[in-house]
Amino acid sequence: MNEQQRLASRQANSSTKKEEKDYSKYFESVYQPPSLKLAKKRGKEEVKIERDFGLPEEFRDFGAGRKFYIRTYGCQMNEHDTEVMAGIFTTLGYEPTFSTEEADVILLNTCAIRENAENKVFGELGHLKSLKRRNPDLIIGVCGCMSQEESVVNKIMQKNQHVDMVFGTHNIHRLPYILKDAMFSKETVVEVWSKEGDVIENLPKVRRGDIKAWVNIMYGCDKFCTYCIVPYTRGKERSRRPEDIIKEIRHLAANGYKEITLLGQNVNAYGKDFEDIQYGLGDLMDELRKIDIARIRFTTSHPRDFDDHLIDVLGKGGNLVEHIHLPVQSGSTDMLKIMARKYSREHYLELVRKIKETIPNAVLTTDIIVGFPNETDEQFEETMSLYREVGFDTAFTFIYSPREGTPAAKMQDNVPMEVKKERLQRLNTLVNEYGVNKNKRYIGQIVEVLVEGESKNNPEVLAGYTRTNKLVNFVASKSLIGQLVKVKITEAKTWSLNGELVKEPIEVK
């Protein structure tokens, strides 16, 4: 696209006014790549809260007789975004389907955190090309974090011209308008906002199940770890107002939900953007303790922002679970500095000490990257020793995956792939060893299990999770699905526990 075409594109976008609100201030050419210089310009503009989401009359029964299909890649935030998009589709009159062959609209909600995730999406787009040939009226869309990357949008425009629409993470609430444009346009409709939008409340949702629910408490991230694309794809940190969060969770509790997971790219930064009140995650958790719901947990944490007040509140127990996922990424202070994690090995270990002192039965899990540019054998050994010192129950482990547009992608990488794979294998051996040994401690214990459904491996067996997020399998009546029960653990495996039902459903007070 040349400069003249770019200017024409901007003029076309700014002159097309479908609503009274002017969205042009948010929109920049999708051909502008993410960069630290631009992405770090966290403007001081006030983030507005909009609570009046609604659809104009033109969209009444817009999807009547049509079906939609959404495939989701990546984290819980993407899963929750899919729930919102499903809610919007349903409000438009569409019906869900689990078959791409039956769908009138197919959306791929994408993840940009690792190269493997992107490869899966482009592979799926290739498979959908033949379906589009057979059904030219099919609408295919790409949304989520990949859409925020200039190189991805270019690749879609050049090599995947059967894609009808592309939109990003900041304008999901604009789905009806984007969809309408895609249906009547001969060209691919691209609406990617490089500036994050306002916080939109009261969006419709179709939740997965009626036992556990995700609740966003904030959006975006301002940490700019050198390997991470999220600050570019999700924008600056924006917190929802506590009253809106509390209202949503009270509503879920009243509708029978047993467990809530609070979501954010960095939940520990919650409230730091408020200018009118001093209110953080610890304050929010303290208020949520008073709600009549069995369990509340949160993800994802950043050690830098995990403060003493939050630890003290979590120590009060009640419906606040004893499981904390605390990504460390590396056990080497030098590596952490290059990663721009803004804490040291010593700081992390001191944080763990405080957590264990206040919450003696706390279960800690983590994320670890191996093979970061220029990681030495000694630095990797520091990660191994930290894992042992903390005594994690388990970890999500990854070989470093460079993301275009991040500082780490420009670093010289002198760690051979065979060395990276060997380190990952050694780390996973340690993770598995600790996992099974930690689980063996549960043998003979009676634990509280929230029954979620049938086991994936055996429909005659029920499966659920403990407060510390341990998977438990046991034989019992399917009438217990959705209930809290007591189970005696009889066998420990690396990733799960087996047990026997010892008590009927518990009443949670």
From Swiss-Prot:
Residues 207-437 form the Radical SAM core domain. InterPro entries: Elp3/MiaA/NifB-like_rSAM (IPR006638), Methylthiotransferase (IPR005839), Methylthiotransferase_CS (IPR020612), Methylthiotransferase_N (IPR013848), Methylthiotransferase_N_sf (IPR038135), MiaB_methiolase (IPR006463), rSAM (IPR007197), rSAM_horseshoe (IPR023404). GO terms for cellular component: cytosol. Residues 1-15 have a biased composition (Polar residues). CDD domains: Radical_SAM. Keywords: 4Fe-4S, Cytoplasm, Iron, Iron-sulfur, Metal-binding, S-adenosyl-L-methionine, Transferase, tRNA processing. Binds 2 [4Fe-4S] clusters. One cluster is coordinated with 3 cysteines and an exchangeable S-adenosyl-L-methionine. Belongs to the methylthiotransferase family. MiaB subfamily. This is tRNA-2-methylthio-N(6)-dimethylallyladenosine synthase.
